């Protein structure tokens, strides 16, 4: 049986002492074949939280941006500075 996981990198609340929260959302999805980032949160906080969770964002294969609000795309530049090879999926007007 294949194992899939979804890890919250950025959300309004935190349940781990060392992580930080902010308004926004970023989820790290791991499948047997792919690593997917769903949204990037409001800032570069996803980079810090990913490091604390031992998630290497350089291994992300694809980034999915749900919509163009800043609390879902604000960390885009920070993510692309870490990973310039991931395929980005979004509506044309987001970029």
Task: Cite the ranges covered by each PLM segment.
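Active-site metal-binding motif and surrounding structural segment of the metallo-beta-lactamase
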Residues: 45-90
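Metallo-beta-lactamase
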Residues: 94-95
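Basic/polar N-terminal segments that are highly enriched at the extreme N-terminus
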Residues: 1-3
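Conserved beta-strand hairpin/beta-sheet module of binuclear metal-dependent hydrolase folds
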Residues: 5-53
């Amino acid at each position: 049986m294949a194992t899939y996981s979804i890890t919250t990198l950025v959300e309004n609340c935190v349940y781990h002492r060392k992580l930080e929260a902010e308004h926004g959302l970023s989820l790290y999805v791991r499948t047997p074949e792919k690593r997917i980032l769903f949204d990037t949160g409001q800032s570069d906080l996803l980079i810090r939280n990913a490091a604390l969770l031992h998630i290497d964002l350089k291994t992300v294969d694809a980034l999915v941006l749900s919509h163009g609000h800043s609390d879902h795309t604000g960390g885009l530049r920070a993510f692309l500075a870490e990973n310039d090879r991931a395929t980005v999926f979004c509506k044309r007007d987001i970029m």
